[in-house]
Curated annotation (Swiss-Prot):
Transmembrane segments: none annotated. The gene is rplR. It holds the Pfam family Ribosomal_L18p. This is one of the proteins that bind and probably mediate the attachment of the 5S RNA into the large ribosomal subunit, where it forms part of the central protuberance. One of its GO terms (molecular function) is structural constituent of ribosome. This is Large ribosomal subunit protein uL18. Keywords: Ribonucleoprotein, Ribosomal protein, RNA-binding, rRNA-binding.
Amino acid sequence: MANSKRTLFLKRRLRVRNKLRKVNAGRLRLSVHRSNKNISVQLIDDVKGVTLAAASTLEKDLGFVGKNNIEAATKVGSVIAERAKAAGVTEAYFDRGGFLYHGKVKALADAAREGGLKI
């Protein structure tokens, strides 16, 4: 039976997350979710089970015109870097989930790095 795109995505997400957890135990996780219309990112403490900071194109006060493009992803990356600094976080590991490290996901990670977050 052929695997569907969704099944392949879920397998890839589990594989990536399990590899990252083995190497980065105890560190904070910068988790990305990308949909067809929006992109969001969370800074998660897996030990405590708490989200320390989050940013998304769904936030009205950030004033996104185009919500699902590289410019919006760059802005979300810089916003999460600012919020991480405000929470006292300087270092995290990047969890791309099942998404390829290309385009919007890469732009978000680069903007977070430029904002001072060590990924």
